Structure formats: C-alpha cells, structure tokens
Amino acid sequence: MAELLLELLSEEIPARMQVRAIEDLTKLVGTGLAEAGLSHGGLRGFVTPRRLTLVVDGLPVAQPDVHEERRGPKADAPDKAIAGFLGSLGLTRDQLETRETPKGPFLFAVIERKGRPTAEVLPEIIYRALTALSWPKSMRWARGQFTWVRPLHSILAVFEGAPLRGAIGLGVSLEGLPVGFIADPAAAPEGTPLLAFGATTRGHRFLAPEPFPVRDFADYAARLRQAHVLIDREERKRVIAERAAALAAGEGLRVKDDPALLEEITGLVEWPVPLMGHIDKAFMDVPAEVLTTSMRSHQKYFSVENADGTLNARFVVVSNMDATDSSARVVAGNERVLRARLSDAKFFWDQDRKAPLAGKVEALGARVFHAKLGSDLDKVTRVRAGAAWLAARVPGADASLVDRAALLAKADLTTGMVGEFPELQGLMGRYYALHDGEPPAVAQAIRDHYSPVGPGDACPTAATSVCVALADKIDTLAGFWLIDEKPTGSKDPFALRRAALGVIRLIVENSLRLPLREVLGSAISTYGDRMLAQCGKADGTSSDVIEHDLIAFIAERLKVQQREKGVRHDLIEAVFSQGGEDDLVRLLARVSALADFLASEEGTNLLSAYRRATNIVRIEEKKDGKPVSGDPDNALFEQDEERALSLALDTLLGEVSPSLAAEDHAAAMRALARLRGPVDAFFDRVTVNADTPALRNNRLRLLARIGTAMATLADFSKIEG
C-alpha cells in the first residue's frame, strides 16, 4: 500500500474560503478514487493561508483487473441491434460468445480490462478535482484559462516517494490552442505555460522561502515545521489561544472570548506568534465596544479584559513572523497603526455627541429603507404607530416612554460612528441617548430593539424594549409581505426568517397574550390606504390574505424553533391546523399538555384507538361512496358499550370546553384520557359492521364522533408515529 501527498501552493487564500475549499477538494479526490476503483485507507485534508494539502493513505499500486460480462441481444437478432451492442463496447463480432439461456441463445461479451498503474491514474484524478473545485471568487493569470482563487505557484504530487508525471496547462499554446491536462510535460507544445507536478515545496514566505524536496507526508510535515509552517489548522488555533491566554494571564488579565475572530486569525497565519501591546490611555474614554470593534474588524486584534470583565488597555496581536529578536518593533508598529484607527473612532465619538440624538431623526428621511417601502423616517413613523398599539397591550408599558424610544430607535444610523461601524447600531444610540439625558428605559430600548438577532442572543424583557422591538420586526414582515418580497428556498436577503423568530421569542418568552391576526392587521394598516393601493392590496380581502400567509410563515418558523428545542413539530401542526389559534402562548401550552398526554399509556392507546376508528370510517365511506354524517341515534344502541361510549363522548365535550376556556390544558387532557376505557371496551365487544344497515350506520356515526370530539383539542390526524 502506498501514500499520495498533494499540496497546492498559492498566494494567500481568503480565510473565509479555506475550510470549505479543503473539504471540497477532499470530496472531489475521494470521488475520483472511487470512480477509478482505487481503494484507500482514508483521506486527510490540511489548509493554511497559502496551501491546500491532501494525504491519501493505503492506496494500491495499480487498479484491480476488471472482468465483466455483458449480455447482448439474441443470437438471431437483426444486424443493426448487434452492431449497436458492439459499438457501445468497442468490440467486434468475433469477440462475442453465444450462450444458451432459458430464453434461448444470446450473445455475451466478456470484457477483460487490466488495471492501470495508480501512478498513471492519479494525475488525471487530480486534474479533474482541481478544475471542478468551485471558489466563491476566482481569477486567471498569465495567458490563463485555468482559474484558481489566487495565482497557483506549485503542485506537489508525490506517490510512493516519487513525483507524479503530469502538468496543468495554464492557458493557450503559442498557436492559440487551449491546453488542459498534459500527461507528459516534455511533449507539450513549445511556449505553453505549464504547472508541472513535482516533489518540492516552500516554507514560510519570509522565514523559509527556498524550495526543498519531500518524500512523504511525515517528511513534509516535519520539514514544513522546521520551515515555520504549521499545516494543521487545529494546532495553529490551539497555539494562538493558549499563547494569547498565557500572555494575558501573566499580567493578571484574560483574553476576551471571540471564537469567530480566532477562526479568522487561524486562517491568516502559518506561524502564529501572539504578542501583547498597549492601547493609548487617551482612547480609554471611548466606549469599550467601539474600541473592541475597531481592533477586531480593522486590525484583527484580540481585546484583553480585567478580571471583572471590563476592557483593559492591552491587546493581543498575532504575528505571522518569528519575532524573537524583533517583537518590540512588531508591537510598536501595531500600536502605531492602532492609534491612527482609534483616533478616527474617538473623532466620531466626540463629533456625534455635539448634537442631540433627537436632532438626527429628520436626517433619516434621506436614507432609503427600501425603494418600495420608503425611507428610514417612514419606517420610524410606522414603528411608532405599531409600538403605541402594543403599549396598550403589553403589561407594564409606559406609552410615553415607548413612543420616545420608537422615535429615537433608528437615529444613530445617521451618526459617523455607525457609518464607520454598522454593527454598533442601537448600541451607540443607547450611549448617545444617555449622554442626552434620555430616560434609561428609552436608552435601553434603543439598544435592544434589534434583538433578538439569533438563537443565542438575549431576548428583551423590559416592557419599553419589547414594544419597540416587536413593532420593528412586525413592520418589517408586514412591509415585505405587502410588496411580495418573501423568502424563497435558501434565499432570504432581508432576514425575514430571523425577524419572524424574533417575533416568536418576544411573544413567547415574555408570555404576551397577543392575537397574531390583530398584531399583523394593525401593522398592515400603518402603511395607509395610499400605500396599500399602490401595492394592489387596498381591499380588505387582500389584507386578510397577507395576514393568513404571514401567520402560516410564522407558524413554520415556530415549528423550526420548537423542534430545535426538542418539541415535536407534528404536535404544533396538530394544534395549529385547527384554525383560529393565533395566541402563541396558549398554543404552546396546549402543545406541551398534548406532549405529556401522548407520553402516557392512556395517550398512546387512545391515539391508536383514534386511528383505528378513523380508518374504519374512511374504509366504509369508500365502500358506500358517501361520507358518514350526522349524530348517532341513542335509541338504536343495543349494547352497553355503545351507550357507555356515547355518554363518555358527551361528558368529554362538556368538560373540554370549560377547561380550554380557562386555559387549563392539563384538565382537558385528563378529560380526554378518561375516554380510553369506553373506547377500548367498544372495540373489544361491539361489531361495527352489523348485518342491519341502520345499526351499522349508527355505529359508524359513533366512531366518527370520536374523531370529532378529540378534534376539539387537536387534529390527531397530524400526529406522527
């Protein structure tokens, strides 16, 4: 068994593309090996900013020989049919055999194909993988037809300790002919730009740029380490995290946890060397979030915190150089660059506070929210109306505070700081509002009205924040539904799925008793008759359609959210599909009670009985060609089990309605559980298909009534399992 080592050395690959690229390359080469019939012991992929590396263990030195038999047409088939069979295999008539079969004599082809040496097959597999690898962005160079994310410098391809034979044509020959894979580089047309497979690589761009040969993966990894390259991404990540933490701990500090930044920096360096620098004290009065964001987004520095979580005037930079002798110069250079960056941030901070936040609201009129939905100022007007409607319905909400927060919520979008750092929207509004003397509840709502932005984000709980956050998200959903800009498939350019999940969390986590139809209807009405007319939605029917469609959309997002929390989606569907239920708190309470009921022995058995009853009714309806309708006639009951079941159903209906009205869902389920005994007894002792037609029809009506009674709690036909 032999080993294949493949390395593609290029200019720097963007960090965000690296992991996907090595995964795709591994998959493409693996597929090529399988198609070529080459078994192996596994593929391992490695990626650095400049190289994609793949090692395949346990390869055979040659493909297996192939023995294959193909049955063709009958021996006396027309010549045209036989010729077609021969043409498909590339054989002649004398190479076929005639064999007797139970269906008569048939022609057979016996194909013997000797396996090719693996060293001949691998270059073709590699070429196909390279040309099939898709990058989000790619480029050509020289006279290139071949594309790669960045100019490709070399291809190391070593099998059994020797370089594979072959090359990739990077463009066209002097005659203008396109060039692809070349099995023999020496035979390539003169002047053809080639990238030949070889057995050499290079180390760190600056610390070890000279080429050196390698024999196998062990030699490759060891020599690259000597050449200041760690090819294992996880090792580089671990080195960065551990050494940065050690630097901070040596000062009694800690590195601010930032997994995304750690991932990005891992893709920027081949030889990570964390170093600690200082932030000029003159910038420490700027909000910590601004400093952290500037260091993170512009410089890729880790922030450093004190033991209490406050920002310290230190940072960690990860150098791509072995800075043993020059670490002081590296740190000083980074501190100098950071001072320039933070000077800009401090300028915005000082300038933005010279005018009150309220004075910036009118400037929102110059910002387009959406071409069909008006400006950001138009959105603020709608959000104020929606928030006022909610303030009258959210417990503890102060209408004046809610209105003020809604008015100022988007004002920081016009500031220099948010223009430079859009991710600080809302947060800067809070700082500026507090500076202006706005009430803390208003400032908090300005910050929180974008939340929650993801499943891990905290959900606002303060009444003022909840009103503004909910009004903002509902307005967004209503507006984009109004202009038919809905999510399709995997595309959701306006983050409407996230907005819907935000609506769900705000309502459910704050136990808000808000009928969705009323909430959505109020939001749609804020667009005004003129806007509705422009969108062709002026009539009430169209508005109702939007409400219905939006509720269905929110219901789907609710299923996704609850499924991720371990709740069965079919139970949500069973409750939601009854129609008329748009109170999410009540709906989930009923779903929870239904889940508990179905987990019990009574629930499991009653569900089976329900299915048995509905199946019998459906089968008999099909036989009769008409639906079972009407209530059973008590006078036709002949057995005690019929009477007991009918009485149990009457009792159930009498108990369920008051329980549901009181939102005592557990009591409703207990009432349902008491139906099990009469149902089991009925099926044990009563023959539904009685000889007398009237008796049979009456018993079918009684069975149908089981489904009708249970449907007052949920649509049990939607329940799976």
Curated annotation (Swiss-Prot):
One of its GO terms (molecular function) is arginine-tRNA ligase activity. Its main location: cytoplasm. The gene is glyS. One of its GO terms (biological process) is glycyl-tRNA aminoacylation. It comes from the Bacteria. Keywords: Aminoacyl-tRNA synthetase, ATP-binding, Cytoplasm, Ligase, Nucleotide-binding, Protein biosynthesis. GO terms for cellular component: cytosol. This is Glycine--tRNA ligase beta subunit.
